[in-house]
Amino acid sequence: MSVDFIVATPHDALEFNDVYRNTTGSAGYLACNNIYNRVVLNEWYEINPFPDLATHWECLDGARRWRFHLNKAARWQDGTPLTAHDVAYTHSHAKEMGYTGAMFLQDVDHIEEVDRHTVDYHLSRPNSGFLVLLGNFIFAHILPAHLYEGTDWSTNPHNLKPVGSGPFRLVDWTPGEHVIMEAVPDHWGPQPAIDRLILKIVPDRDECVRIVARGEAHIVPQDTLTRDRLHLVPEDSEAEIMTRQGPGMALLDFNHRQERWKDERARRAIAHAVDRSEIDRLGDPGVSQAWDHYLLGSSEWAFNPEAKAPAHDVEAAERLLDEAGLTKDANGSRGDIRLYYMDMFFGHKPLAEIVARQLEAVGFAVTYDGLSSPDWASIVRRGGEFDLIIVGGSMAPDPEITATKYSSAGRNNMAGHANADVDAAYEAAREATTLAERGAHYRRLQEVWARDTEWVPLFWYGMYYPRSKHFFGWADQIGFSIPWWHWGRMRRI
């Protein structure tokens, strides 16, 4: 009897190549986790990497060179052997062209094909956190060089008809309806115990949750089940609810390129205007909460409990704004603020509403809006056309993954951060070779973030997943040895 595993998701696919262009949370993003492989794997809740294409690896030359030994059995879904050339080409070309896959390759000087199944990443500087950069995100997956080399990635037909090395291959994408994948027969890696993986496109988030509760689907993506939707999954349903503290936080960031935010007093004033007692009403004890620290408390090895955002103080906020020259005009206005968030993160909308209201209380005229993933990339990431943003993202299992956003040379530094002390702390943590030493430098990083009010922490978010009672093989059940959105180990029970 054929076994289907069904995911109900509100976001359709755009394409199936997140190395070229990442569309966070889309059906294409979810599919790529199952069609392709990475060199190594990391998940949010486990700092140690697991094998994927690489069976084992070596840290050489004081973390300036990383050698990966690839699985000699690995094959592309068209039967072509997967080799070191595929790995070297994918990441070298992504970096050369500035594609999304280059986001975490900042330190890579060049990639050497040592032999057919061995590849060396030569770094321009030591980076003891390099493994988590290769393993933590979908846009680090490897593409087939024999189908991409010499082509324009933006128009390559395999973006829509992918040929991966993973356990599932695409058989049908009907936009607005579904993405259907089937298990690859005689897959070189672990053979799936399900026959088809189906992403069912259901734009209404409430209905996504309901169909899992009814047993018509088996899981939904992040931010589909939220605290206010928990009632949609009754105790006698076909689903159980998995809850967990999240791997990241929602925070308020400044457009540091604007003159008004270059004055630390103005940034500190904004932080003082934020009242977390109102934000905390969005929380769920043990799962999510308002947060005023600069790293998650779950990252105990790196967490600095002394580094905190300024407390709520409207009087201090008003005084600092005046001192920074952001005084009120004759109408009592300190100016306009455009505040954006990414609309796929459902919990960011109420945060935007709260922050907008609190900033209006100190004299700003605030407009806020949620952007789709493509619009976010265009308006915020590339265009810099914003004043403030509410942004999320993982901070676990290693703070090194945050450097792309908050270091001066970070490829995803959309807010224009340029703080020499921040850069120095990241650099020192990369050069350190023990977790204890690295943790000390990350505690210094948080101290600098707090001292200079580089950004404002708002909310440590939680995760809610309604998932089928009739399947086993979720990431948390097998030691986070696979990506959260990888379903190749699922089996019916």
Describe each model-derived feature in a short phrase.
Residues 26, 30, 41-45, 136-192, ...:
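Gly/Pro-rich hinge or "lid" segments in bacterial periplasmic/extracellular proteins
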Residues 111-113, 171-182, 198-258, 281, ...:
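Extracellular/periplasmic solute-recognition and catalytic clefts
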